[in-house]
Amino acid sequence: MLRTLRPTLPSRCLRLYSTAPEKPSLKLVAELRKRTEVSIVKAREALSASNNDIEAALQWLAKDLETTGAKKAAKVGGRTTNEGLVSVSILSNFTASGLQRGIRAAMIELNCETDFVGRNELFGRLAGDIAHTAAVVAEPGASVFQNLSLEFLQEAPLVSRSDPTSAPSGTVATTIRDTIAKVGENITLRRALVVAAEPPAADAAQALRLGQYVHGTIHQPTEGRIGTLALLGLKYPSPKGFTQETTEKLASLERALARQIVGFPTQSIKGSEETALYSQPFMMLPGELNSRPVGEALQAWSVQQGIVGSEGDAGAVEVLEFAKWSVGEPLES
């Protein structure tokens, strides 16, 4: 009886085959990185773990970031943070008679360990979003300028400055934690200030306006090393309020005052010393009033705009209050 003979293969030549997951395409990796700003390695890992499904990969990354972020935050939590940014956000900068409009603004200081991270676009976006969130939650209180509780702010849902209508993806605190995981440095929210005023009564004789200026900006004109907010009080020149031309000149005056506060060692509004705003030469105001003491220049400007009849009429345009912050400066006790 004949038998079919087959060669016997050595056991070492036997192989088992299985279907390996498809390698994530460069297009999917790029799309995921664009939406999350994770590294290429992390994007590939997320897609591989999610069978190349973008939405599933986003969920995977969110869970991974929560875990790694908490570990990283705990690891770097004791490190000193002396660098960073001051960020300003203004939702509404004036009150006006007859308009149901109040002032809403905020200024925050966000710190990190190095100037390198302080200049990072991701860090700058975080600072801007936190300032915007602070302005959104601002409510009028006993004074127009108020310190905002950091605990309250960190528990608030983070509102995107660039897309404020989008649903928040987390709180201020969780977003700081996630950013720590991405940049590898400790990040701390040092202080927050809100400016809030209700719309004035219909027969109000004074308007409020808020000026701002940030020095040492990097990615946005509202984020830098030094920031200031300055509140102005103005008498109405007539029951109809200000003309369009005067309003435009007011905007220039506000910016000049804010720049003056930042550019000089300004510590108070009135007084005889050089740290008093009204005694300083108004170097930041262009035109014929340049170099006159700020207090005198404001009175002369009011006459030029027809707000008052003579420079002897006090209180036509006043700086009522200001806040000036520098990154890393000592805080008042």
Swiss-Prot record:
Transit peptide per record: 1-17
CDD domains from the UniProt entry: UBA_EF-Ts
Single Gene Ontology MF annotation: translation elongation factor activity
GO BP: mitochondrial translational elongation
Key words of the record: Elongation factor, Mitochondrion, Protein biosynthesis, Transit peptide
Protein origin, superkingdom: Eukaryota
UniProt GO cellular component terms: mitochondrion
Cell location: Mitochondrion
Functional note: Associates with the EF-Tu.GDP complex and induces the exchange of GDP to GTP. It remains bound to the aminoacyl-tRNA.EF-Tu.GTP complex up to the GTP hydrolysis stage on the ribosome.
UniProt similarity note: Belongs to the EF-Ts family.
Record-given protein name: Elongation factor Ts, mitochondrial
Taxonomic lineage from the root: Eukaryota, Fungi, Dikarya, Basidiomycota, Agaricomycotina
